[in-house]
A protein has these predicted regions:
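N-terminal beta-strand motif that seeds the catalytic metal site of vicinal oxygen chelate
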Residues: 1-20, 73-74, 128-133
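Vicinal oxygen chelate
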Residues: 1-4, 8-16, 48-53, 64-133, ...
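Core segments of cupin and vicinal oxygen chelate
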Residues: 12-57
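Residue-level structural signal for beta-strand termini and adjacent loop
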Residues: 39, 64, 121-123
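Conserved beta-strand in the GNAT
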Residues: 58-62, 119
């Protein structure tokens, strides 16, 4: 039996200026900056995460650099227990690329057969941290 996914977590979008993009999404779609995740935006390579008014849709705004081809990735969400099951499942399938501690969340990364990037993220940080030690 496959582990359960809760839904999409966030969509990566490359932009030239994260602040200007966040303002545009606010003005056009009502998205606001997710204050609890702004620590990631302190790093030039990290995302500025914004969300819709209901907190259901998250966009991770990444700064596009030079001739870089924009990154497209789908990030799914799972609770802590299911996240660990997915980690084991992907490892068994030999497609788990890495498991990353983001200090407020955990993510696992893998690619499909065509090289498209995928991620599963959980915000049950304390639970997963305790299980991975």
């Amino acid at each position: 039996m496959l582990p359960k996914l809760n839904g999409f977590d966030h969509i990566h979008i490359d932009v030239l200026n994260r602040k200007k993009a966040a303002e545009w999404y606010k003005n056009i779609l009502g998205f606001t900056i997710v204050e609890s995740l702004t620590v990631w935006a302190e790093d030039d390579n990290g995302p500025l995460t914004i969300q819709d008014p209901f907190g259901k849709i998250h966009l991770a705004l990444f700064r596009q650099r030079g001739n870089f081809t924009p990154l497209t990735a789908i990030a799914f969400n799972a609770d802590g227990r299911e996240f660990l099951k997915w980690k084991d499942w992907l490892k068994k399938q030999n497609i788990l690329l890495r498991c990353s501690d983001h200090k407020v969340a955990w993510s696992i990364y893998f690619k499909d057969l065509y090289g498209n990037s995928h991620e599963i993220t959980t915000y049950e940080y304390d639970y997963v941290s305790s299980q991975l030690k």
